[in-house]
């Protein structure tokens, strides 16, 4: 069974979806689901993008099954590496997804990041930050949305072009391949042909460097977007000779 390995319910600050809606949507679309609530301990607004993990397991364990798994999306940061590692070690998540949501302490959603510096400088810093964070979060199962910055980059063209940032992207890809960390195909933006075309060289390069597996995640915060653009993601994986997988009890399984 194919899994949507990245979605958020009410334990995430920015989600309005309850777990029953997520389960129902997964069943209707014949998808397994992994809940990955946000933990961003360095988020600049205190109290946001954190949740009560004990309560999460207490409330959601009854839903756990071979089609409904419980994970977490950890916002990586060098300054919170010890706290994040403690969370990883303490709790029995099925799946730990590692993300970059901040740059120099600012949410990548914030337009001020892009107004103050040229695209090349910001994008290079983004990949440098990603690599630095991966080096102190080697335990994650998958690297989320490598193209996250392109959602919000307030430039005339906010896309990532592999040939422009290949040195930085290759360092990230080599690291995760060496550490056997999987990469996610995030489907949020895959409704656009040009996005698929721009991302394809990154995933092909991952494959060339020895990467074999991908997780596929919608990053859904609403029931209607669970499984969004999965057809395009599965085609991308096939074209790059990558096998879709999911994680249960931190063990990789074939989708």
From Swiss-Prot:
MF-aspect GO terms: histidinol-phosphatase activity
GO biological process: L-histidine biosynthetic process
Pathway linked to the protein: Amino-acid biosynthesis; L-histidine biosynthesis; L-histidine from 5-phospho-alpha-D-ribose 1-diphosphate: step 8/9
Cellular component GO terms, alphabetical: cytoplasm
SUPFAM superfamilies: PHP domain-like
EC number: 3.1.3.15
Keywords: Amino-acid biosynthesis, Histidine biosynthesis, Hydrolase
A Pfam family hit: PHP
InterPro entries the record matches: Histidinol_P_phosphatase_HisJ, PHP_dom, Pol/histidinol_Pase-like
The reaction(s) this protein catalyses: L-histidinol phosphate + H2O = L-histidinol + phosphate
Family (UniProt): Belongs to the PHP hydrolase family. HisK subfamily.
PANTHER family (alphabetical): HISTIDINOL PHOSPHATASE-RELATED, HISTIDINOL-PHOSPHATASE
UniProt protein name: Probable histidinol-phosphatase
Species: Clostridium acetobutylicum (strain ATCC 824 / DSM 792 / JCM 1419 / IAM 19013 / LMG 5710 / NBRC 13948 / NRRL B-527 / VKM B-1787 / 2291 / W)
Lineage: Bacteria, Bacillati, Bacillota, Clostridia, Eubacteriales
Gene: hisK
């Amino acid at each position: 069974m194919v899994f949507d390995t990245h979605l958020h319910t009410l334990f995430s600050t920015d989600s309005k979806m309850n777990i029953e809606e997520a389960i129902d949507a997964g069943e209707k679309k014949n998808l397994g689901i992994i809940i990955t609530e946000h933990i961003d301990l360095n988020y600049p607004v205190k109290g946001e993008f954190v949740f009560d993990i004990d309560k999460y397991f207490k409330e959601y364990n009854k839903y756990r099954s071979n089609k409904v798994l419980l994970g977490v999306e950890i916002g990586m940061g060098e300054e919170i590496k010890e706290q994040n590692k403690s969370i990883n070690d303490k709790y029995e998540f099925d799946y730990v997804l590692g993300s970059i949501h901040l740059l120099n302490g600012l949410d990548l959603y914030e337009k001020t990041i892009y107004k103050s510096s040229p695209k090349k400088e910001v994008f290079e810093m983004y990949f440098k930050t990603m690599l630095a964070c991966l080096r102190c979060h080697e335990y994650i199962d998958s690297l989320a949305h490598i193209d996250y910055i392109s959602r919000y980059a307030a430039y005339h063209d906010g896309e990532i072009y592999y040939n422009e940032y290949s040195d930085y992207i290759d360092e990230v890809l080599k690291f995760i391949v060496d550490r056997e960390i999987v990469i996610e195909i995030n489907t949020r933006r895959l409704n656009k042909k040009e996005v698929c075309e721009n991302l394809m060289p990154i995933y092909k390069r991952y494959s060339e460097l020895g990467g074999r597996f991908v997780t596929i995640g919608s990053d859904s915060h609403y029931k209607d977007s669970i499984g969004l653009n999965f057809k395009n993601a599965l085609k991308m994986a096939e074209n790059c000779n990558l096998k879709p997988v999911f994680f249960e009890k931190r063990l990789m399984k074939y989708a």
